Design a protein with these regions (language model features):
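A general secondary-structure junction signal
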Residues: 42-44
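Short amphipathic alpha-helical segment that frequently serves as the phosphate-/nucleotide-binding helix
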Residues: 19-23
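Active-site-flanking beta-strand signature of metal-NTP-handling nucleotidyl enzymes
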Residues: 3-8
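Short glycine-biased active-site loop of nucleotidyltransferases that positions the nucleotide triphosphate
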Residues: 49-53
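An amphipathic, aromatic/His-enriched active-site/gating alpha helix that lines ligand/cofactor pockets
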Residues: 24-36, 54-57, 61-96
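Structural beta->alpha junctions
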Residues: 9-13, 64-66
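Short, conserved charged micro-motifs
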Residues: 14-18
Length: 96
């Protein structure tokens, strides 16, 4: 099983627009072979001392059955199209 945490730093004031665009691909991604989980998460205030809030960060949590399934997902033409569309909304992103 492969777990992926993608951290997306969204341009100020663009988080809701980013989430609308992102949620548009979720059903298609979840239908892909090997996709176990795929969802976005945003920070909210919990009051816990170690928490660092960043209202412009979206964390995308993914779980795939295999590395091959993840590579096939990342290589999908519709994902390339999606990344091109969200480019205007994103400052930077990284995965772990």
């Amino acid at each position: 099983m492969i777990n992926v945490l993608a951290t997306v730093h969204v341009k100020k004031g663009k988080v809701q627009e980013f989430l609308r665009l992102f949620k548009g691909i979720v059903p298609r991604v979840r239908a892909e072979k090997g996709c176990i989980e795929y969802f976005p998460a945003i920070d909210f205030k919990t009051g816990l001392p170690p928490q660092e809030l960043d209202e412009n960060v979206v964390t995308i949590m993914e779980r795939w059955e295999s590395l091959e399934d993840l590579i096939n997902h990342i290589s999908s033409p519709y994902i390339a199209e999606h990344l091109e569309k969200e480019k205007e909304l994103v400052e930077k992103s990284s995965i772990k």
